[in-house]
Amino acid sequence: SPAKSVDLVAFFFRRIFQLIKEYGFQALIATNTIAQGKSREGGLAIIQQNGGCINFAIRSMRWPGLAAVEISQVGVHKGEWNKEYVLDNKIVERITSYLDDSEELGNPHKLHQNKDKSFQGSIVLGKGFVLEPREAQKLISQNPKNKNVLFPYLNGRDLNSNPDQSPSRWVINFFDWDEDKCKSDFPEVYLIALNKIKPQRNRLITEKIEKGVSLGVHDRRASEEWWIYLWPRPELYRTIAPLKRVLVVAQVSKTLAFTFTTKDKVLDAKLIVFANESFNKMSILQSNLHYHWAWKYCTTMKSDLCYTPRTIFETFPFPQNLYQESEFNLDQIGKTYDEYRRKLMLKIQLGFTKTYNQFHNPLLNSKIVNGEVVSRKELQNKFGKETVNLWNHLQKTEDVCSIEEATNDIKHLRQLHKEMDEAVLEAYGWHEDTEKWGPAIDLAHDFYEVDYLPENDRIRYTISPEARKEVLKRLLLLNHEIYEDE
């Protein structure tokens, strides 16, 4: 990767490496994206290919100053290194350009079988498109034809925050129609667009010009066709048209919660949409096997995972030549998990983010109240912040279940997730000893620290570090195998 194709920080890493003498050292601080995406490919990976050896690293830590960023510390030795490797203050066998200690087996390839099955939602560009539900309903009451250009608008925040994953706003959508049609067929909605969207688009263009930014094709189109989304994603809506529902996940999230939604809405750019309506695919994507693959090959935004279809989904190797029994098992556990999770969130009135905060909370305990009068600080010291948050929420919310009931329900969700992971492992054939793959993998579900998360939020209910390392190794080898066959 030429230096000009990467960011400035990766360039400095490479330039300093060029300048130091043989057997010299360099040690730098960067945001944690130095080990992700193109920054990794054009920075640390190039350094290693040219004789550099990463012998020390802190993969991710909060910047000690005021800036809300996650940083990495990276030490590089120029030349062969025969001493200890230290990763996150632990001695390891090696450190890769991903700042982990996995075997060096190369990078995953995009697979043809996953092509055109995942999409980013529509990039609207303009707050004027967005309406409150009452405003949209009023416009439809005034003119029933307006329902053809007014839709519920689902974004990542609603998906992860609302207990029923329902959209909280509506949006105008004139598709790719010409201005005359919009003006004549939907005059009330067109007038709103003219008064709100057009000035916003013009202001965005003016600001770019004032900053000396050269205008591209998309900028000119955004100005000239101001009533149309910047990226309407016709290929997305055309692909999902035959389906009854689609699978979605928030693009930026620490939970990575996949769920189904109906297609009668505009899906925002902060959603990744999968042209899939089967529970067996949902089981695989929601499993810890895919979860750790996603974290390995993602980029991050602050400390959250940013799900990119090209680097995560298109490279992910699904089980090949599934037996009918395995497909049935995946369907059944996926459906059971999805239905139980939906009922649980409605019952405790929490969205994905806060529900999974409890899912990963090792101190969750129904015996938080035992008749003693104690301070919030004492409760938090004993049961943890998340447990106290749940207890307070249930106390304040009417007609919601008790802390005992909520605790038992969340523990059952963990059990279902464990069963789903085991069904996915079996679909790959890794639940038993084989000549091709070696010994069976024991997933060993429990609460573990995961090194890719911030220091103050690393506990997850997941598979063991040993299982994670072996799963990622086999998935990468399977990716290479499928790629060669294609």
Which residues fall in each region the model found?
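S-adenosyl-L-methionine
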Residues: 1-69, 99-486
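Polar, glycine-rich mid-to-C-terminal structural blocks
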Residues: 75-116
